[in-house]
Amino acid sequence: MTGDEFASLLGDFTLSAESGAGARFASHFTEDAVYHDYIYGPHQGRADIAHMMQNLFHRDATDYRWEMFDPVFDGRQGYAWSLSSCTSTIPQFKGRRVVIDGMSRFVLRDGLIAEYRESVNGGVAMAQLGVGPERMAKVFKRWTGWLERRPETIDYL
């Protein structure tokens, strides 16, 4: 896969995420892929990834928009900066619009995504929603646990 082909993959990847079509979104992944989402946690395999997109993302928000910028690709893994936005449908935050930026890491195998990770400042999204400080602290502790338990973090420390 070339850098241009990677950029094209990202374009279709984000359009399929915006559409909410779980199977279409999951078709970008290998059968055993893992999608590490900062809100919903890890999802493994196409069926679970499709469920996450269609039944979690699009249950909790509408008006999704996701764009990737400045993609780089070395033949095995790629990175891109992104902006994403949505409008919450969660009752206590209904109608509130959120916009966040993030960095995405893609490990590819045979032209498909084998692993996806993202790094975003979810606190910005929670502030835009009006999430209370106690709930934010609880979520931040969960995210801290995810980071500290990752094999890469353990090896690093």
Residue ranges of each PLM-predicted region?
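Short, low-complexity N-terminal intrinsically disordered segments enriched in polar/charged residues
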Residues: M1-S27, E31, L147-L157
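Hydrophobic alpha-helical core bundles mediating ligand binding, dimerization, or RNAP-core interactions
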Residues: L10-A17, F29, M53, F57, ...
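A solvent-exposed, acidic/Ser-Thr-rich amphipathic alpha-helical stretch
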Residues: G22-G78
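A beta-strand edge to alpha-helix "cap/lid" segment located at domain peripheries
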Residues: F57-L157
